[in-house]
């Protein structure tokens, strides 16, 4: 439909189609005032598919009425502008800048106009763009039609019905509608400039970038100078970002008229400088950090990084406050008065609790190759802990502070009785140190049920001493020692292994008589089975493991494991099978011979 109408127009004229909905009376008035030519889409052609041939955006039918196509002559656009400014009372005192600041209440501010240039093919049908307009249908980009007779660029815009009808605007809807149509068209064409007809057709963009939405927005034609970035401010910000860089040296001193930024530019950063190992003075050990930092502070040519000294905490660690140093430590000068008090208490405790015979003098020091572990002080805690502190039970110590012997409950469990019996047999130097459990309010009611868990805390040297004592006793009492009892068990102690009952009277305890009878009946039906079982001890046709599973009871078969040498004598059964097999063969042979003899005699 549009192609047929456009062939009647001049080739030099470019058209812009505008789709909207309205009544026929308003469209006739707009035609007289703005020199617009309206054509009813449904009346132009009888076929209902006329809208599919439009090059503009196809809109769905709304409640406002039927759609119309509006053709605007670009050459007469200036005349329309002049007529509108002279006739409309709202646009008498406004200049061209009025159209830059024009705002329509029916057009949302986020809508943009993209002046796109598309090409109309010579085909009859053009693919549609189905757009569903809202109640306030905003200005939308359309496909500009490139006529076959004209290669000039056409302007295609879609104007909403509310813009042309002016239903939501106060005052005369026709007069205000005219000014809004002209202002919207002018603002959409402002980006293209007024020299389009002079300079000819502008180059058609190959692709539409997303940045065009901001550049060609409907109300963003006034660019402020504040939006442009300040170059000097950007340079200053980039310099501030690199303010944390350590600078080694400057090429020149700061003058009176020079700024601080100019002096910073003369510095050379560490990253770009050549790496010199001896200037950094990296200490080899952690203990030499303090000495190296002190040397760097006094050296005249030290780098700028040495100004920041590594802060080492002078106060002792938290765990050092609760640890008592051992008597071998050399921290008498640096320790606090509390450490001296704890050290004296530890010496008193060690002197009282380490009274041993001359044979155990080696236990005074720590074991060779192992560090000494200091003893913990009493740590402050809840009130229930202070009532029953952790006690350490020693062999000969009767009174010690803060440690004392733990005597246990009044009703000891069987486990404690056994431990007491074992402790009596131990030598005097082998008395174990037992840690008592901490009492609590929740566990006081269950003390009778729970047994006391005693864990001996023996040192490595004590264990070594016990081994040496045992060796000495073994040398003196070698005749009374049962060597067989000390040997580790190298066999599985089950009933099926130690089953010497087969050689004794307990035959029924090992073998199953029912299974033996069933096997013999099967072998009597098939006589070769007797020889297979009897002679398979060497040829391994029937192994001992399979034969035991056939003959033994269920209790013995449950513990049988393949791959072991079982202490079960099965030769009697194999010999019995050979005897029965030979007897059966003799009986069969005799029967056959008797049969032949009877037959011969009858003949």
Curated annotation (Swiss-Prot):
For the keyword Transmembrane, the answer is yes
Task: Name the principal localization, coarsely classed.
Answer: membrane
Compositionally skewed regions (Basic and acidic residues) per UniProt:
336-350, 463-479
User: On the Extracellular side, which residues?
Assistant: 1-515, 599-603
Composition skew (Polar residues), residue ranges: 96-115, 439-452
Q: How is it modified after translation?
A: N- and O-glycosylated.
**Residue ranges under compositional bias (Low complexity)?**
11-25, 84-95, 325-335
Family per similarity comment: Belongs to the BUD8/9 family.
Name of the protein in question: Bud site selection protein 8
Which organism was this protein described from? Saccharomyces cerevisiae (strain ATCC 204508 / S288c) (Baker's yeast)
Taxonomy of origin reads: Eukaryota, Fungi, Dikarya, Ascomycota, Saccharomycotina
